[in-house]
A protein has these predicted regions:
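Short, intrinsically disordered, charge-balanced linker/junction segments flanking boundaries
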Residues: 56-58, 74-78, 453, 458-461
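C-terminal tail/sorting-segment detector
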Residues: 439-461
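Compositionally biased Ser/Thr/Gly- and acidic/asparagine-rich
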Residues: 10, 70-431, 440-441, 456
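Acidic, glycine-rich segments characteristic of secretory precursors and extracytoplasmic regions
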Residues: 1-69
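Serine/threonine-rich, low-complexity intrinsically disordered segments
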Residues: 44-47, 386, 449, 456
């Protein structure tokens, strides 16, 4: 049987898995035995070039990898003179078909079809797994049919049944990880992937946080031919969760395109502690966005409804451009108003569905941004920049100063929305504000009103 896997035109990594066991080599199959028919096969490069079956380049850098589930590390394939075994997952840099010019790093990508001829896999398939608590394992679809990865994990032993990690080649420059929450079919960044693993596709799964031995067995009953169409994105029980998706966008060909993102789901059944319901972040090749909770980077953070003391710090790494923007998706959300806090510029922007916030990359980008929350009862205007409150944090009994205006109305509220009386005096180019009652330790909300703007600042005592 000859199987075919269509690959759209883009120079990017793909997570692939043959559904046949071959009696011929990788070279004779995916490399078309060095054939040069348009739209068929691809170049595969590696150490010592043609000696090991690879296509020769000036550097012979590897483009085909396997993942050692035992050690948890990528390993370059050392030869394409070996045969395929159905269900073996690979990471392959697909440049295009075999007419691509290997002498340049920027050839025009072309679509292609990867073919493999052999015996179809039937019966059970049990991959070797990473047995470390919380360890990741690379698993391929062994069948020439869609597989419901949710039912696979539900039947597994000591595996995290709520999350799976795809590689989406359409994201960013070379592709990026998409984290799929299997309990509600939400992804950290908008993507067409769903719970149905396509023929020829591979994914990462995660072991539960336990030392007990895990096992996964993919069976014929996990095939899902009727429901396996790719490109379907569904959300089940949408009213059960408040959703906040943070998308990082870059300007490509004069269009803003989402290249990375993270997702927060809000429900009082969740916790602000990191639990098995959260999805940890896998490292990307290019830009990387995650929420940070308890020193853990999360692609999907499942948290209870926030209070005014709640924060979702954003970690931002591997920036390749100068200019970006945040784009937000907010749905079914009820609770304290979310704001994007820029710690570098000391600005707050209310997060609404579809809102965008441009920014320029700096060396402080890694922990520059966070999501904070303010009481809905205050009916706050958007935060604006230009005023600075200090000291912040402050000690109980201290005054604070508002720099940037000497003619403003200053009011203070506690987190319950109760007014705190204050005395306000002009001190040079600042206002000295002194509460007239003893304050308890906690969060207070300072409102500064001028003729042209209103600013709300969180003050910590």
């Amino acid at each position: 049987v000859t199987t075919e896997r269509y690959i759209p035109a883009k120079r990017a990594f793909r997570f692939l898995s043959p559904s046949v066991t071959t009696s011929t080599s990788i070279k004779l199959n995916w490399q078309e035995n060095e054939g040069t028919t348009a739209g068929l096969g691809t170049h595969i490069t590696g150490v010592d070039g043609a000696t090991n079956g690879f296509d020769t380049t000036a550097t012979n850098n590897p483009s085909l990898y396997t993942f050692n589930n035992t050690s948890g590390a990528w390993e370059a394939v050392t030869s394409t003179l070996t045969n395929f075994t159905a269900g073996t997952p690979y990471r392959l840099m697909v440049r295009g078909d075999r007419l691509i010019n290997l002498s340049t790093n920027t050839p025009t990508a072309t679509e292609t079809v990867l073919r493999a001829t052999g015996t179809l896999k039937t019966g059970n398939f049990s991959p070797t797994l990473n047995q470390a608590a919380g360890g990741f394992s690379f698993v391929g679809n062994p069948y020439q049919a869609p597989v419901n990865i949710k039912t696979v994990l539900d039947a597994a032993t000591y595996m995290n049944t709520g999350v799976v990690y795809y590689w989406d080649p359409t994201l960013n420059a070379r592709g990026g990880y998409v984290t799929l929450d299997l309990t509600n079919n939400n992804t950290n960044v908008t993507s067409n992937f769903n719970q149905y693993l396509q023929p020829g596709q591979a994914v990462f799964v995660k072991k539960a946080n336990t030392p007990s031995a895990a096992s996964v067995t993919i069976t014929e009953s996990h095939k899902s031919v009727a429901n396996g169409a790719a490109g379907v994105f569904r959300t089940t029980s949408p009213n059960d969760y408040g959703l906040l998706r943070v998308n990082l966008q870059a300007n490509t060909n004069n269009q803003w395109q989402t290249i990375e993102g993270s997702l927060a789901l809000f429900n009082d059944n969740f916790s602000w502690n990191v639990t098995s319901e959260d999805a940890t972040k896998m490292s990307n090749l290019d830009e990387e966005v995650s929420f940070v909770q308890n020193n853990t980077s999360l692609a999907i953070a499942c948290v209870s409804l926030p209070s005014v003391t709640s924060e979702l710090p954003i970690q931002l790494n591997n920036l390749r451009h100068s200019n970006y923007q945040w784009q937000f998706e907010l749905a079914n959300y009820q609770g304290e108003r979310p704001y994007l806090y820029d710690t570098q510029n000391n600005t707050y922007t209310e997060i609404t569905n579809g809102a965008t916030v441009p920014f320029t990359a700096t060396t402080a980008a890694a922990n520059r941004f966070k999501i904070v929350f303010q009481p809905s009862a205050l009916n706050a205007d958007d935060f604006t920049h230009g005023l600075v409150l200090y000291p912040n944090p402050a000690k109980a009994g201290d005054s604070f100063y508002v720099q940037g205006s000497t003619a403003a109305e200053v009011t203070v509220y506690n987190v319950l929305g109760q007014h705190i009386p204050v005395q306000v005096k002009s001190q040079g180019n600042a206002l000295q504000v002194t509460p007239t009652q003893t304050l308890s330790q906690g969060i207070y909300l300072v409102t500064v009103r001028t003729e042209v703007k209103t600013q709300h600042i969180k003050w910590i005592v």
